[in-house]
Amino acid sequence: MKPYLLKSNLWNIVGCYVLLVFVFAQSLPAQNNVITFGVGSFQISLLSEGQRQGGTNVLVGATDEMIKKAIPEGNYPSATNAFLVEAGNKVLLFDAGLGAKTIENMEALGVKASEVDAVFITHAHGDHIGSLLLNGAKGFPNATLYISKPEYDYYMSDEVMAGLPENRRGGITSVRNIFNAYKDKLNIFTPGEIENAPELLPGVRAVAAYGHTPGHVGFLLESDGSKLFLWGDLTHAMAIQMPFPEVAVSYDSDTAKAIESRKKLLKYVCDNKIPIAGAHIQYPGMGRLTKNASNGYDFTLMCECEAR
């Protein structure tokens, strides 16, 4: 994979951090779709399908006071992201976006879909699995697909299928079709707590982050002493969920569990100074947390100041 735009260790960018406390978030300008950072010897590339503004109608547990303080304009920056990782001689994809745009972004980096060795899915919502199956064919023909056991079990459950109204069963069927397409190279894993998460491949650990879906996970990357936590949909509305982690979204399958996972993992990455990347974090999709005086967090976006 060719490093594109930016190569820099997440903790060694001198004078390049743009501090952005989301309380004061502004509307986003048009952004590039790809940018690359370094984590040890790993190269981590954002593959973004676009930036957008989210609304308060999906927020759960957000009081008028919270909204007025965190997002007074009534909306917040969001995005749809996947991440490509070059780890030694392996090319790894973390989440697969909405569709073919993910592959187009990879090609902008000089990487073909056939070169991807493994695809790690945080959960099986449509904006994370869209390029896995395109026109009935595997989007990544040589890749092993990694999915957590609780997520796999949920989508393969006949009881779950039977309990859904007819007009909602298509989503389950679509996910099953993906699992079937990759059945010869399907790795179903059991994640663990972030303190001792199991290693799936060298430098890639699977972290339980349940709540958004029954088997939602994050992936902790480590190379040469540097770390990055890819947390999937642990957050959707950074502007309000950082200062107020107790705010959830309407499409969390288990609100209480999602809040519990978010609070625990935010504390861990903040205490251990681990940079993070997220599927719905605005460009460039990565940053780090600091604790604020109100028992919440401030978020610092990674800087693109070394972009070429």
Functional labels for PLM-detected ranges:
Residues 38, 107, 115, 149-208, ...:
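Metallo-beta-lactamase
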Residues 1-10:
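N-terminal secretory signal peptides that target proteins for export/translocation
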Residues 93-97, 118-125, 146-148, 208-211, ...:
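Active-site neighborhood of phospho(di)ester-bond hydrolases with catalytic His/Asp-centered motifs
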Residues 100-146:
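Active-site metal-binding motif and surrounding structural segment of the metallo-beta-lactamase
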Residues 32, 53-55, 124-131, 154, ...:
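Active-site environment of divalent metal-dependent phosphoester hydrolases
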Residues 13-25:
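Bacterial N-terminal signal peptides
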Residues 222-308:
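Cap/insert and terminal regions of metallo-dependent hydrolase folds
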Residues 33-108, 218-234:
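Conserved beta-strand hairpin/beta-sheet module of binuclear metal-dependent hydrolase folds
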